Regions:
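Charged helix-capping and loop-helix junction motifs
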Residues: 5-12
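An acidic, carboxylate-rich microenvironment
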Residues: 11, 40, 52, 162-165
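Phosphate/ribose-recognition catalytic cores of enzymes acting on nucleotide-derived substrates
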Residues: 70-192, 196
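A short, hydrophobic C-terminal helix/tail in secreted or cell-surface proteins
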Residues: 197-203
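Glycine-rich, Lys/Arg-enriched anion-binding loops that position phosphate/diphosphate groups
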Residues: 16-115
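Short, small-residue-enriched loops and turns at beta-alpha junctions
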Residues: 1-3, 31
Length: 203
C-alpha cells in the first residue's frame, strides 16, 4: 500500500505503536497450496479458465445487465432465440468463445450456452457482446435484468462457412451445456405444455 506500494506489515506494526491503533494481520488465503488473490483470478479469467477462477471466488464470474434487442438472427434464422447483453467497456471478460452458463432471472435459475465475442459469422457492425441461449426457456425478457454466470469454457469463437454450419454447431453447443448442467448441477429439462403459445420473443 502507499506510495509505489512500499508499505508492508512491518511498517504498519511500527505505525500502530506510534499512532496507537490496533493492528490485526489477516493471513493470506490459500487453496490447495496456492495463494488466492485478485491478480491470480484475473489471470485465470484472461486465459479462459473460468472453472479454476470460479473456485477461488465466492460467486462464479458473471455478466449482469439488461437484455437488449439483437439482429433477430437467433430466432428467425438459427431457430435458437438468444438473450443479448452489452457489457460495460471496462468489464473484465474472458477470451472470446463459447461457455456453459447459468442464468438468474428474478428468483429463477436456468442453464444455457453463452457466446462472448463479436459473432464473426454474421455480417455487419462488430461490437463486444454476450449472447446466451437459455435451455428450456420461453419468456420475453427484453429490457429485463439478468445475471449470466460463466461456468465452463466450451470452445473458441469461430467463423463458419454458412449459417447452416453455425446453426448445427450452436445446437451441438446447447446439447453439451445440457449434459454439463445435468452432470454437475442435476439439471433436468422443464416440460412445457402449449409450448408454441408461450414461445419466447428473444432474438
Amino acid at each position: 500500500f502507499g506510495y509505489k506500494r512500499q508499505g508492508n506489515v512491518e511498517l504498519l506494526e511500527r505505525m500502530s505503536k506510534e499512532y496507537d491503533f490496533k493492528l490485526i494481520v489477516i493471513p493470506k488465503l490459500e487453496l490447495e497450496g496456492e495463494i488466492v488473490s485478485s491478480t491470480r483470478i484475473r489471470h485465470l479469467l484472461s486465459e479462459g479458465k473460468v472453472e479454476e477462477a470460479n473456485r477461488l471466488m465466492e460467486d462464479p464470474f458473471m455478466i449482469c445487465g439488461s437484455v437488449v434487442h439483437g439482429n433477430h438472427m437467433g430466432a428467425e434464422v438459427l431457430q435458437m432465440p438468444t438473450a443479448n447483453q452489452i457489457p460495460l467497456e471496462d468489464k473484465l471478460l474472458p477470451p472470446n468463445g463459447v461457455y456453459v452458463s447459468r442464468i438468474h432471472y428474478k428468483d429463477e435459475t436456468y442453464y444455457g450456452i453463452s457466446n462472448v465475442g463479436v459473432k464473426p459469422t454474421i455480417e455487419g457492425k462488430k461490437h463486444m457482446g454476450v449472447e446466451t441461449y437459455i435451455l428450456d426457456f420461453h419468456k420475453n425478457i427484453y429490457h429485463k435484468e439478468i445475471e449470466v454466470e460463466l461456468l465452463c469454457f466450451k470452445r473458441p469463437e469461430m467463423k463458419f462457412d454458412s449459417l447452416e454450419s453455425l446453426s448445427q454447431q450452436m445446437h451441438e453447443d446447447a446439447e453439451f451445456a445440457r449434459r454439463y448442467a445435468k452432470e454437475h448441477y442435476g439439471y433436468e429439462a422443464v416440460s412445457y405444455t402449449h409450448l408454441r403459445a408461450h414461445e419466447t420473443e428473444l432474438h
